[in-house]
Amino acid sequence: MTQHDDQPAPMTFTAAPALSGGITVPGDKSISHRSLMLSALAVGASRVEGLLEGEDVLATAAAMRAMGAEVRRDAEGVWHIHGVGVGGLLQPRTALDMGNSGTSTRLLMGLLASHDLTATFVGDASLSKRPMARVTEPLSQMGASFSASPGDRLPLTMKGACPAVPLDYRLPVASAQVKSAILLAGLNTPGITRIVEPIATRDHSERMLKGFGADLAVEVEGDGTRIITLAGEAELRPQQIVVPGDPSSAAFPVVAALLVPGSKVTIANVGLNATRAGLIDLLREMGGAIEVVNPREVGGEPVGDLVVTASALTGVTPDPVRAPSMIDEYPVAFVAAALAEGRSVFRGLEELRVKESDRIATMAQGLRAIGVQVEELEDGIIIEGSGGAPLAGGGPIATRLDHRIAMSFAVAGLVSKNGV
C-alpha cells in the first residue's frame, strides 16, 4: 500500500500459498459500542467479555466515563461498567473526542438528546468531513438543538431536551445508526417512541435494549416493513455480556480463504445475526463453500464457526435492497467479484460515498490500478471478473486512511502476480 497523508510506511501484500488452520476475529464493533452505552445507563454493575478494544470503541468508553459512568478493564481483559441509570448522565467537562468513530458520534448524540446537558463533539480530519444531518434532523424534532460546522459536520455542539418529545418517525434511508440514535433518545423520553423501518437494518440495538429490560416491541408487516416501539423513561438492568466475533472483520479472512487456491480455514465464534449476513449469503450465491458449524446463541445473538474452502466464484448482481445487510463488507466483496467468472453489478450503494472515504471511488481507482476492469457508477460499480486468474497487481493503492480499503486490497494482494 502506498503512503497517504500521515500513514506510516507503505506495506506490500504478495501472492500466498494455500491458507489453512483456525483463527478468531475481534469482538463485534456494533455490539461493543452498545454494550458500553447501555451498561452505562443501567442501574448497577455490568460485565462485558470480548469487547473490541479498537480506537472507535475506546472513544465510546471514554465518553461514558466523562459523563459519570465507571468504566474499567481488569487484568483478564474483562470490562466492568457501573451505570448511572437512564437520565443520570452528567455534563461532560470537556469536548467528547470521537476520533474516527461515526458510530460513537451518532449514537451518543441520540443518547444525549433527551438529557438536560450540553456536549461538544470533535473528531479527526476524516470524521469531520462526514455529514451528521440525517441524525440531527430527527433528534431536533425531539427537542434537541445543534450548532454544527458548515455542512452539518463536526465540531458540533448539542443541547439535549428534558423532557424530550416522543417521536413517530419513518426512516427515509436505511440506517441502523439513525434508528439507534432515535431509540437511545427515546429511553429518557416520556411516552412512546415509534420508528417505521421500510428496509431492515442491523438490529443489535433492538435485541440489546430488550435484553437490558427496555419495553420494546417489533412488528413486521407483510411487505417486510418493521414497526419498532419503545416505551420511554425505562429502567435498565445490568447484564453479563459476551461479545461475539465481528462478521465485518471475519469478511477479510473469509474472502481470502475463498480466493487463495487450496485454502481451508475455520473462523471461530462469528456473530451470525441475519441483519449482518449479507456477505456470507452473497458469497454462497457466487459459489463460495462456506459452512456454519456449531451454531449456538450467546446473549441473544446467533453465533457459529465458519469453515471456508477455496472455491471458483461466478459474477453476481445482488438486489440493491440487500445493501444494508453488508454495507461495510462491499469493498472486500468487490475484490471477490474481481476474481469471479463474469460480470458483477453492484447498485444502491450511495451510502458508501460518505463512509471513512468515498468507498466506491476509492475501490474503483484501486482495482483499476491492479489490472481490474471496472466501471464506476453514481450508486455502485460494475466489475469484470478474471475468472479466477491472478490479478496483475503492482499498482500503488491510496487507502484514504480507510481501514476497510486497506484490508480489502491486502486480500487482493494474496491473489496477485506482482503484489499490492
Regions from the PLM with identified roles:
Residues 1-420:
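Structural preference for solvent-exposed beta-strand-turn elements
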